[in-house]
Amino acid sequence: MELYFEKELDRLNPYQREAVLDESPACVVNANVGSGKTTVLITKIQYLHHIKKVGYEDMTVLTFTNKAADEIKSRLLAAEPELPADKLRGFGTFHSTALYYLREFLPVEDLGYSKEFLVIDPEEELELAYDLIRQHKLKIKYKNRLKKRLESAMAVREAEKKVSKYQDDIYELAGLLKEEKAKQDKMTFFDLLENANFLLKEAEQKSVSPKWVIIDEVQDSDTQQLVFTDRLISRGASLFAVGDPNQVIYSWRGSAFQIFYTLKHKYQAKELTLPINYRSSTSILEAARCFLQNGSPLTGVREPGSKIIVRRQYDAFQDACYLAARMKKLHEEGISYGEMAVFYRLQSQSKIFEDVFLREGIPFEVSLKKTVGDVPVLKWCIRLLRFSLNTKDTASGIYVLSSREYGEGISGKKAEEIVRAGQPGKSLLFDRMCGLVENCRELGNEEELFTYFELDRYLNPVSASFHEDSDAVRRLFGIMYAYVREQQAERASGMREFVNSSSLYGSDVLREDISRQEDRVKLMTIHASKGLEFSCVFITGVNHGLIPLRTGDMEGEEEERRLFFVGITRAKDHLELSYYMNPQERADPGESRYIRMIPPRLLEHDEDIGPAVSLQELKRQVQEQRRSMTAGCLEQSPGQSLEQNPEQSLEQNPEQSLEQNPEQSLEQNPEQSLEQNPEQSLEQSPEQSPEQAKQQKLVRHSRYGTGVVVNEDETMLEAEFEGYGKKEFIKAFSELEYI
DNA sequence: ACAAATAGCGTTTTT
DNA sequence: CGCTATTTGT
């Protein structure tokens, strides 16, 4: 083993080797993009184990995502296949490690919990809070923002909790919620760390005392995670942390300020640097250097490579069409689609690319954050299992019975009665849930479980999404059975563990079918691109107002710059930036100043925004296609609410009016059509062509009188009434009369 | 019951 | 800044 390890060490560059061999009790490694950070981290772990004879069980390796933790574990196992998995129990995300400590070593009873406590998602905590408000008749203002208000209330110190800003009972609620969670044996992600931190301060030394704390992507730590680290270090652990201050893009969700500085001072940590980037061509690196905050060195070792292409486009649609053609060409040249990626600033920007790529036959995959909670049927099923496995969880029982979409659709009051009384015979579904643990032995696979709950009946067979729903549920059950088998646990307790483990929230329950075909173009936000790399990267919409997004303060501005830095450093060989002359969203037309910050000699401008006569026709077809699609599956997609924004903005954009008069628009360059019709932009309703504005449509309403139609589509109608102003109506329900 | 006043977003997302 | 949801005032 030691010999094998010598070879590993030889493969490292001097900087990497120094980090691995460093002997100081605390060391932070300032690792540049693409400098082999993960390799150093893994080699360090192996070094500690094989050479320094530190047991894996004496190491705590902390990451922020399950994905990162899985990668580290699987790379260790690949090098050492006979390594028993339970030696790596201390390897995982901050939250899963806190969970492990709480379950195995820390006296959670001191906080009123049992060892079998449950992990709940934020939404369930919110439900609990609303329940408490009702039960205790608390006065809470701005209930719609309760989640945010509670978050800030929980962060306030005990001493300052006298009167709330709005003079309501928010602090009382926070206190009650804490009690209630302990009573119901439930912890949120926040509680996992908070409680672990509290107990680590008090508990006896021997219970948890790793010899090493090793942290990946340490720049993303928030205060809670910093405290967790500190608790372990003050128990005698040495520290080895790796991260990149130039890749801080999550400070808005609380990553602590200037971590490297803090760690260096707090623990007299030695700071080492990994300056050499192996990933990108030197042109790309040179451009990236313009966006570094501090003058940290960033050295490349590769050839200059091709210039960065900057494209001027009329709008996102034209860009999408260009990209489709460009990618086809690259594919013909032998670059696989999997090596290409399109980045944008906002989730809502993906839609137009999806539509065009679908039409053009480009295989693609959109990276969307989806958890079980985002799919209504799975959310319902999890609650079904939760109550079945723990009938004390009455909130889940009530939720399942009173759901409108699934189950028996019992009213909330009645459901509460049944669940609280706990008497059988009132509801078949309720009886089945209560009987699950008893009958568990006979239910050997997902199909039998499905049948046991009579889900054929309860998953709302008349709904359009029934097939999709039952497939999703079967898949979830399948994953659960696989988990139980893998853990070699007794069935009921294995299921309980699955349903309550944070691993559930991190697992790819929904992505099974996507990963089959790998050769796809990836579409994602720049945020989501962190940690990935592609041969060809296309960053789209590099306009001011998008990249950078209009931000209030300096800090936000700097974060935007780091974000762009992250985006361009994902590219290995080829990078293209595009900006729009007619951005439909909040962006300004023209190139972002970020493009101007790159030395011109690195750039190649492509300013031809040719008229492409058929483009308008194509665009019309794409929009038509989308309309028929969204009409068909309105209720199935959980992401629907997110996707409504681009839809709306599309209705308002000028193309809508072009679509209504195709003959007129076709021979015009789209850019001209806007500039040549100044009256149009002065109109109150730009979606109407001048002709339509002249022959105004009038409607009569029983209450508001006669009004002028200002906006109209298939479902909605907006009219302006004299003395009343504008009013929106749903056509199907309003009693409107055309005049 | 309606109108005026006020608060606080806006985007990015993991556990 | 401009919009929306909510609270507060009449």
Regions found by a protein language model. Give the residues of each.
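P-loop NTPase Walker
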Residues: 1-110, 286-289
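Accessory C-terminal helicase-associated subdomains
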Residues: 421-528, 549, 604-607
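C-terminal accessory regions
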Residues: 543-634, 692-725
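Conserved RecA-like helicase ATPase core segment
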Residues: 2-4, 224-312
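Conserved helicase core region in the C-terminal RecA-like lobe
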Residues: 92-100, 214-217, 242, 346, ...
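ATPase/helicase motor core of nucleic-acid motors
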Residues: 266, 306-307, 335-450, 460, ...
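Helicase P-loop NTPase motor core
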Residues: 33-41, 45, 105, 269-270, ...
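Accessory N-terminal region flanking or inserted into the helicase ATPase core
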Residues: 1-35, 39-40, 58-60, 109-110, ...
